[in-house]
Amino acid sequence: VAPSEPSPGPAVPATGRWSGRLRVARVFQETPDVKTFRLMNPLGGVLPFTFLPGQFLTLTVLTDGKPVKRLYTIASSPTQHDYVEVTVKHEAGGVVSGYLHDRVKEGDLLDCSGPTGSFVFTGRECKCILLIGGGVGITPMMSVIRYLTDRAWAGDVYLIYGVHAPRTSSSGRRSSTSPAATRTSARSSPCRTPRAPTGRARRDGSRRS
């Protein structure tokens, strides 16, 4: 991360793996320990790369003079050509997550590369999809759901989402869903929400209290 001016980048989005710097345009506090970082082309205009829903970026930060890399799944939709978002949980003792949460601010530049990953869904693979995620692990699912919504996909979307408690849910700020989406959520610890299902999900779809 650096506050300096960026070097010139490509004039058109790259279709393969890209490497360079992106500017932190916005930082959203999703939960007490989860932040979303909105990254944009420091030169303005569209992103210098394209991606598929479900792919991730590699972020590199310098700690103690050494580069440290971490992979973060893209949470935004590929239809948003002007920015890309990654959602990061502050893990206890996490070198990069701690750096991002404690030191990175709007206007900073982040060294990024990508996109990478084959866990993708564009709507062409089948006519319905079941997504299962927990905690901050919902980020690739949110990218998929937002993309399908933006494209007015006619298929059925089912989302099973588990969190430890309501305040730890990472999907609250812009939990856009497909008009055909069905969502089931469960919390592993009790909460005050009336009739909120509690328990860990089993393989057969039931919950273990």
For the regions a protein language model found, what residue spans apply to each?
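FNR/FR-type flavoprotein reductase catalytic core
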Residues: 3, 10, 15, 93-209
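Ferredoxin-reductase
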Residues: 3-108, 127, 163-165, 190-194
